[in-house]
Swiss-Prot record:
The gene is infB. Residues 375-379 are annotated as: G2. This is Translation initiation factor IF-2. It holds the Pfam family IF-2. It comes from Leuconostoc citreum (strain KM20). One of its GO terms (molecular function) is GTPase activity. Residues 341-510 form the tr-type G domain. Keywords: Cytoplasm, GTP-binding, Initiation factor, Nucleotide-binding, Protein biosynthesis.
Length: 840
């Protein structure tokens, strides 16, 4: 057999075309067409007509035409003859006489363009399909099927990864292999696509073979699942990951016998208790007529209905009140077996300028006094110092009367009280107040008689004065320790520290560092960069960075923790003062704090405490009884001075507010409508504008937007850094709120010299100032024959063509009077102003 070669698109034989049925020609035309056909074939070098009879069911003419088309389609380039040449000849050869046509050879003339031998002889290894034999066509079909099978084998070649998957799932690959073999067998037997078409000679089979998704039987070919899908990158990533692991089915846990719930649980909490998905619980509640989400709190009735629908019992779990943090400070909650010694907490108290801050400055080797406005401590500071390896914690409280609450707060968290009394000044009102606070807190008192270095110092006189308040020195048989010191030069300061440590040993101060930290807020403020900052004193336990904490009516998580020198600490032991950040709002000075187990519990406790505080405020002002009705009405009849107080720290806010409320002016009281820590903002200005309040800023400034808004709304903002000045200004404003007394003051006399009438303006009076002056803002009294005819205001004041605000004596001017045109020449005008008489 001749060597077979693959057919390309250029040498592949054309598909058999459908030849329409032709009518029988007359005998004369058939003879003429036969001569033309013989001549053309001989000149073109084609194979002579076959003398074989036509197939059964076909006419002679049809067989000739099909043979002619078949032989011409195999010629390279298709230039030897046209496909429908025989048809043209059969119709009479109307195109045979065209110049340059190849059919000119039938007239005996050589072909004009006959330069090559247009032979249809097949090439080496090529099958001659010009011969109309069934074997050659079957051989073509067989070769075509072999090529298709080879191409399919290349396409279905699988990589190593796909071979592994195919080995894992043999059930999916076997039907494909069987289907391929069946198709190949059918094709070889001549009943496939081409075999069926050639055997039957039906043209519709060829059309069916062109459908991509159908096989020879007309059924749709199944999709090839083994073909790689996706981009090359995605297949490469999938190959690295390996075969997908099938997901395991989730085993549903059984329902609990009893659902123990608490008030405020949401769907997420219930899903953990019921071992069910949140979507299932939400769907079940929806079917029960309750629309909710997974974060919404549910009441007791809803939870009980859900438990009944699941067929289980429900029981309310009684839990302790997490919002009540005061119970953690009770003595019965402390385990005495785990107590260890702790440093003493000492509060320094005394009158103004008696040297408390100077003493503390010497102890901690820092300069605090120079930074305080007016040389007075403005808020509590907490510091630590060491002596002979032992630590002492000091709390510095202001001595001014405005800071009464802060001194009381300091006494409540302290172990010892250092009462500083100036030797040259003696006992003062704040000294007595400090003694009372220390006695109320039941804390021992150590008296430090300061300023013994001054010439007029008399320490013995101070000791005698304090004996009247049950502070008897040990020299006189009492139990009160007296130490004579000079804080400025450090004289006898070490002796004072030794007395403190000695007294601490007597008190046996201990704490448990293993419990959750708890303590008190010494000071709090709002920092621009760090947010709310609180100075706290740890009284029990150990505080660490990251602990969830409840502080007063707010909560948070300890983000940073620093000591008085700004050094960051990882933990704070008992009796250690630290500054913490991370709380949501600025707490009140004196609030208690406690570290919770988790942030969720801390948040619940803080929100509940804030809610209770708001309810207490609303209830305190809403109840009116017959006993309080008259007093309430009296208060509403009183004049008030609304004030908004903003300060840098909470202690200053409380001190300034308390001092303002104590100002006594008959018939007037101060109404503090808002207090806060931080800069004065737009909200404060808006509130002041709506209520007519004065804004007092203590050691704070206003934002640029607040300043511009205050200018436009004409809101009075006052800034202070010394509390005395703020109190004096507010007291003056309160005195101004009383009914003012005005007196009339004549500032000038004017005589009308001439009148000028204008239709648009009216009458303009030309006059001269005889005495004093006249201003545009002054009032005028027009007198005619010493009788007042009109009393009103100046509408306009001019000199020449220019408007002026004032005209002095000896000058001429023109003026008009508001709402009055009956002025006459010779009238005398008296200019005057109303001047307020200050209340003494």
């Amino acid at each position: 057999m001749t060597e077979e070669k693959k057919f390309s698109s250029s040498n592949r034989p054309a598909r058999k075309q459908a030849v329409p049925e032709r009518k029988e020609l007359p005998a004369s035309q058939r003879r003429h067409a036969a001569k033309l056909t013989d001549g053309t074939n001989s000149s073109a070098g084609t194979t002579p007509r076959s003398n074989k009879p036509a197939r059964q069911g076909q006419s002679q003419g049809q067989g000739q035409n099909r043979h002619t088309n078949s032989s011409r389609s195999n010629t390279q380039g298709g230039n030897a003859s046209r496909p429908n040449q025989s048809k043209s000849q059969g119709q009479g050869g109307r195109n045979n006489q065209r110049p340059g046509s190849r059919t000119q050879a039938s007239e005996g003339r050589p072909m004009i363009r006959e330069k090559k031998n247009w032979s249809t002889k097949p090439r080496e290894g090529q099958i001659d399909y010009s011969k109309k034999t069934d074997n050659s066509l079957k051989q073509y079909v067989s070769e075509n099927e072999k090529r298709k099978q080879a191409a399919a084998a290349k396409t279905t070649k699988k990589p190593a990864e796909q071979s592994k998957k195919a080995a894992e799932k043999p059930a999916q690959t076997k039907p494909k292999t069987a289907e391929t073999k069946t198709t190949a067998t059918t094709t070889q037997s001549g009943t496939g696509k081409f075999g069926g078409a050639l055997a039957s000679g039906n043209n519709s089979a060829r059309n069916n073979s062109r459908k991509r998704n159908t096989n020879g039987t007309g059924q749709q070919t199944p999709r090839r699942n083994d073909k790689p899908r996706g981009s090359k990158k995605s297949r490469r990533i999938a190959a690295k990951k390996g075969p997908a692991v099938p997901a395991t089915e989730r085993k549903e846990q059984p329902l609990p016998a009893v659902l123990e719930y608490r008030i405020g649980m949401n769907v997420q909490d219930l899903s953990k208790l019921l071992h069910r998905d949140t979507a299932e619980i939400i769907k079940k509640l929806f079917l029960l007529g309750i629309v909710t989400n997974q974060n919404q709190s549910l009441d007791a009735d809803t939870i009980e209905i859900l438990a009944a629908d699941y067929g289980i019992e429900s029981q309310l779990k009684e839990e302790e009140d997490v919002a009540d943090i005061d119970k953690f400070f009770e003595d019965d909650t402390i385990d005495e077996s785990k107590l260890v010694a702790r440093p003493p907490v000492v509060t320094i108290m005394g009158h103004v300028d008696h040297g408390k801050t100077t003493l503390l400055d010497y102890l901690r080797n820092s300069n605090v006094t120079e930074g305080e406005a007016g040389g007075i401590t403005q808020h509590i500071g907490a510091y630590q110092t060491q002596l002979n390896g032992k630590t002492i914690t000091f709390l510095d409280t202001p001595g001014h009367a405005a800071f009464t609450e802060m001194r009381a707060r300091g006494a409540n968290v302290t172990d010892l009280t250092i009462l500083v009394v100036a030797a040259d000044d003696g006992v003062m009102p704040q000294t007595i107040e400090a003694i009372n606070h220390a006695k109320a807190a039941e804390t021992p008192i150590i008296v430090a008689v300061n300023k013994i270095d001054k010439p007029g110092a008399n320490p013995d006189e101070v000791m005698n004065q304090l004996m009247a308040y049950d502070l008897v020195p040990e020299e006189y048989g009492g139990d009160t320790i007296f130490v004579k010191i000079s804080a400025k030069f450090g004289q006898n300061v070490d002796e004072l520290l030794e007395m403190i440590l000695l007294q601490a040993e007597v008190l046996e101060l201990k704490a448990n560092p293993d419990v959750p930290a708890r303590g008190s807020v010494i000071e709090a403020r709002l920092d621009k960069g760090r947010g709310p900052v609180a100075t706290v004193l740890v009284q029990q336990g150990t505080m660490r960075v990251g602990d969830p904490i409840v502080v007063g009516n707010t909560y948070g998580r300890v983000r940073t923790m620093t000591n008085e020198r700004g050094i960051e600490l990882a933990e704070a032991l008992p009796a250690t003062p630290v500054q913490i950040t991370g709380i949501n709002e600025v707490p009140q000075a004196g609030d208690r704090f406690i570290v919770m187990a988790d942030e969720k519990t801390a948040r619940a406790a803080g929100e509940e405490r804030a809610k209770r505080a708001q309810e207490a405020i609303r209830n305190s002002g809403s109840v009116v009884t017959l006993d309080t009705l008259f007093s309430t009405m009296s208060e509403k009849a009183m004049k008030t001075v609304p004030v908004i107080v903003k300060a840098d720290v909470q202690g200053s806010v409380e001190a300034l507010s308390g001092s303002l409320k104590k100002i006594e002016v008959d018939g007037v009281r101060v109404d503090i409508i808002h207090t806060a820590v931080g800069a004065i903002n737009e909200s404060d200005v808006t509130l002041a504008s709506a209520s007519g309040a004065i804004i007092i800023g203590f050691n704070v400034r206003s934002t640029p937007l607040a300043k511009s808004q205050a200018d436009s709304d004409k809101v009075d903002i006052r800034f202070y850094n010394v509390i005395y000045n703020a109190i004096d200004d507010v007291e003056a404003a309160m005195k101004g709120q009383l009914e003012p007394v005005f007196e009339e003051k004549v500032i000038g006399n004017v005589t009308v010299k001439e009148l000028f009438k204008f239709s648009k303006v009216g009458i303009i009076a030309g006059a001269m100032v005889e005495e004093g002056k006249i201003t545009k803002d002054s009032k005028v009294r027009i007198m005619r024959d010493n009788v007042v005819v009109y009393d009103g205001e100046v509408a306009s004041l001019q000199r020449g063509k220019d408007s002026v605000n004032e005209v002095k004596m000896g000058y001429e001017f023109g003026f008009t009077v508001a709402k009055y045109n009956d002025i006459r020449v010779g009238d005398t005008v008296e200019a005057y102003i109303m001047e307020e008489v200050k209340v003494k």
